[in-house]
Amino acid sequence: FLPIVGKLLSGLL
C-alpha cells in the first residue's frame, strides 16, 4: 500500500 493509504488506515484504527 502507498504511504498515504497506510496513514489513512492508521487514522481509522
From Swiss-Prot:
The keyword rRNA-binding does not apply. GO terms for cellular component: extracellular region; membrane; other organism cell membrane. It is found in: Secreted; Target cell membrane. Coiled coil: none annotated. The modification Leucine amide is found at residue 13. GO terms for biological process: defense response to bacterium; innate immune response. Expressed by the skin glands. Keywords: Amidation, Amphibian defense peptide, Antibiotic, Antimicrobial, Immunity, Innate immunity, Membrane, Secreted, Target cell membrane, Target membrane. Antibacterial peptide. Has activity against the Gram-positive bacterium S.aureus (MIC=8 uM) and the Gram-negative bacterium E.coli (MIC=128 uM). Has a moderate hemolytic activity (LC(50)=75 uM). Belongs to the frog skin active peptide (FSAP) family. Temporin subfamily. This is Temporin-1CSa. The lineage of its organism: Eukaryota, Metazoa, Chordata, Craniata, Vertebrata.
